[in-house]
């Protein structure tokens, strides 16, 4: 070994080393070469260590505890169980008798569920499914395995349906899963018209029925539906529930009924007529309806109109370029609340991303992450507010790519791969999780906009790598061929494109010299483009989408500033008007519109 100091004859290395340790033991004196260092962290070590420990468990080697669950004996290591479960840590490190026992009996837990959880402790893997979730969640709660509790709740969220939401709600309540309980409550309220017809609804105890019908957000067309649901519930087990009718009826908002229904249906029902408290509630409602001048003095929970959260289309703005870098953030605009809210971000930053909606799922294709061109694809599920990356990648990297859906396939059109501008077109089959090449365009196009109309896929404008284009091509999937159609009046790259009132609108973008505010539209019946009134702002890299019948231009770049503002086109007044703004400024982001069929947007 090299000495740390030059020594005189007779000096020993030990003496010298002792001098070296004076002061900082890790620092050699000045002038002495510092030893080379290479910190090393193994990614394999944790996994390989667990694998070996799991093999020891399976061979019953070095095991120091046996868990007895019913008729099952499970061999394990206390240190592993204690590291994974606060329940076992308290058991084995405290003064409990179990800390000294080699066999420990675990009660009130399913054998198979315990096996799965012990396996998870050794492997980090578990499969939650319909057949085990009802035993797995209670077991995870007992062992205080929060990660598995969350996984079970996430699984149950995805299974929510009008036929089972009440059962899931009760299950969540029993096991104190507050988030799952909240989501099940919201789902029940939003889908009450279907829920009230389910067997689970008829089996509800009175207190849970009252909880549901007391909500201001109960989604019903009229209070008649609530009354009918209550009476159906009572008559399902009339002898047992008849005494509970007055208590439940207090939470039906009888003053909101029409006079005809109140008198003709409610007041004449034998169950109502035979109970004094019920008759009093009907009389209260009659007075409210017949004496409008007295209504200010009669306000209360039963006179408060319900305010259900209505469902509709929701606009998503995905990725883009902001503050000098590509971004992964995603936000959504709900016209019902007139609010932009952040949702789950993508796993990658993506500018020049292609976005479209297939089977109520939002796809983000390719783009550029600030340093690399991407061929990866992500898929967003609005029901769970989660992105997944298990979608097959495109055959080549693509940014400034056009993406649209036609005939159940997701098409990726043109773009650039970092080397050249592309005319390549491929389509994704979600059933096969596979991309397949189709006929290429006649022209290379980056910054191209795409739209689907009349069974055809249109590729509008873009740049051939040298200059912006005004040319347009149309793809016929039956022939697998592209055909050239009438060109636009203006050359545009990085434009926005959407189908509105059976015509293709092309807005903004950039020509040879500047960002554009102009707009035009294509009539397929005449094969002609005609000008449309210009937007209030120049917008290159703009997103264009139709949301609940409104044409909206989203974000972009005006030549000076990245934009977060929105404009809406009014075809009657032939004007664009500003319509608020996003949370983030976005250039080259994608937009997509999803119909929220069960009001998922208000669940998470």
UniProtKB/Swiss-Prot annotation:
It is found in: Cytoplasm, Perinuclear region; Nucleus. One of its GO terms (biological process) is proteasome-mediated ubiquitin-dependent protein catabolic process. Keywords: Cytoplasm, Kelch repeat, Nucleus, Protein transport, Repeat, Transport, Ubl conjugation pathway. Gene3D superfamilies: 1.25.40.420, Kelch-type beta propeller, Potassium Channel Kv1.1, Chain A. GO terms for molecular function: type II interferon binding; ubiquitin-like ligase-substrate adaptor activity. Kelch repeats lie at residues 314-360, 362-408, 409-455, 457-502, 504-549, 551-596. Residues 63-130 form the BTB domain. The gene is klhl20. Component of the BCR(KLHL20) E3 ubiquitin ligase complex, at least composed of cul3, klhl20 and rbx1. Residues 165-267 form the BACK domain. This is Kelch-like protein 20. Substrate-specific adapter of a BCR (BTB-CUL3-RBX1) E3 ubiquitin-protein ligase complex involved in interferon response and anterograde Golgi to endosome transport. The BCR(KLHL20) E3 ubiquitin ligase complex mediates the ubiquitination of target proteins, leading to their degradation by the proteasome. It also specifically mediates 'Lys-33'-linked ubiquitination. Its main location: cytoplasm. Pathway: Protein modification; protein ubiquitination. GO terms for cellular component: Cul3-RING ubiquitin ligase complex; cytoplasm; cytosol; perinuclear region of cytoplasm; PML body; trans-Golgi network. It comes from the Eukaryota. PROSITE patterns: BTB. PANTHER family: KELCH PROTEIN, KELCH-LIKE PROTEIN 20. InterPro entries: BACK, BTB-kelch_protein, BTB/POZ_dom, Gal_Oxase/kelch_b-propeller, Kelch-typ_b-propeller, Kelch_1, SKP1/BTB/POZ_sf.
């Amino acid at each position: 070994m090299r000495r740390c100091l030059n020594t005189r004859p007779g000096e020993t290395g030990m003496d010298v080393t002792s001098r070296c340790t004076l002061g900082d033991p890790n620092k050699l004196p000045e002038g002495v070469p510092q030893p080379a260092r290479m910190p090393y962290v193994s990614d394999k070590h944790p996994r390989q260590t667990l694998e070996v420990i799991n093999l020891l468990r399976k061979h019953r080697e070095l095991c120091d505890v046996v868990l007895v669950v019913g008729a099952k004996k499970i061999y394990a290591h206390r240190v592993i169980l204690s590291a994974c479960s606060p329940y076992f840590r308290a058991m084995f490190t405290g003064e409990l008798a179990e800390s000294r026992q080699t066999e420990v009996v675990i009660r009130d837990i399913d054998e198979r569920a315990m096996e799965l959880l012990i396996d998870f402790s050794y492997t980090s893997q578990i499969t939650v499914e319909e057949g085990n979730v009802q035993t797995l969640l209670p077991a995870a709660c007992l062992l205080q395995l929060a990660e598995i509790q969350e996984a079970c709740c996430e699984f149950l969220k995805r299974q929510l349906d009008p036929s089972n939401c009440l059962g899931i709600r009760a299950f969540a309540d029993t096991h104190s899963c507050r988030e799952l309980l909240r989501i099940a409550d919201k789902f029940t309220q939003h889908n009450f018209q279907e829920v009230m017809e389910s067997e689970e609804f008829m089996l509800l105890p009175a207190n849970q029925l009252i909880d549901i019908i007391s909500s201001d957000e109960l989604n019903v067309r009229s209070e008649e539906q609530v009354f009918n649901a209550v009476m159906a519930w009572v008559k399902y087990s009339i002898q047992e529930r008849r005494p509970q009718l007055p208590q439940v009826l207090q939470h039906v908002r009888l003053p909101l009924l029409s006079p005809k229904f109140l008198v003709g249906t409610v007041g004449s029902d034998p169950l109502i007529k035979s109970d004094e408290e019920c008759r009093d509630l009907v009389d209260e409602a009659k007075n409210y309806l017949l004496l409008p001048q007295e209504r200010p003095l009669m306000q209360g929970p039963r006179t408060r109109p319900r305010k259900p959260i209505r469902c509709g289309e929701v606009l998503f703005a995905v990725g883009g370029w902001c503050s000098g870098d590509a971004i992964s953030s995603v936000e959504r605009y709900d016209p019902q609340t007139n609010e932009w809210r952040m949702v789950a971000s993508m796993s990658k930053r993506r500018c020049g991303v292609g976005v479209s909606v297939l089977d109520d799922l939002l796809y983000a294709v390719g783009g550029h992450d600030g340093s690399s061109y991407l061929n990866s694809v992500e898929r967003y599920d609005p029901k769970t507010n989660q992105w997944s990356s298990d979608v097959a990648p495109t055959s080549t990297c693509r940014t400034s790519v056009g993406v649209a859906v036609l005939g159940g396939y997701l098409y990726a059109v043109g773009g650039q791969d970092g080397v050249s501008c592309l005319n390549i077109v491929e389509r994704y089959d979600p059933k096969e999780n596979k991309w397949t090449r189709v006929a290429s365009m006649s022209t290379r196009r980056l910054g191209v906009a795409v739209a689907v109309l009349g069974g055809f896929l249109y590729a509008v404008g873009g740049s051939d790598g040298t200059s912006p284009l005004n040319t347009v091509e149309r793809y016929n999937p039956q022939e697998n061929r592209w055909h050239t159609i009438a060109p636009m009046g203006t050359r545009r790259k990085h434009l926005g494109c959407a189908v509105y009132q059976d015509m293709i609108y092309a807005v903004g973008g950039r020509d040879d010299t500047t960002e554009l505010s102009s707009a035009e539209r294509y009539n397929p019946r005449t094969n002609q483009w005609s000008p449309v009134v210009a937007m209030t702002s120049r917008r290159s890299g703009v997103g264009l989408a139709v949301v609940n019948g409104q044409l909206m231009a989203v974000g972009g770049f005006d030549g000076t500033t990245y934009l977060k503002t929105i404009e809406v086109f009014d075809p009657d007044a032939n004007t664009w008007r500003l319509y608020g703004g996003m949370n983030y400024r976005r250039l080259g982001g994608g937009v997509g519109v999803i119909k929220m069929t069960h009001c998922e947007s208000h669940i998470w």
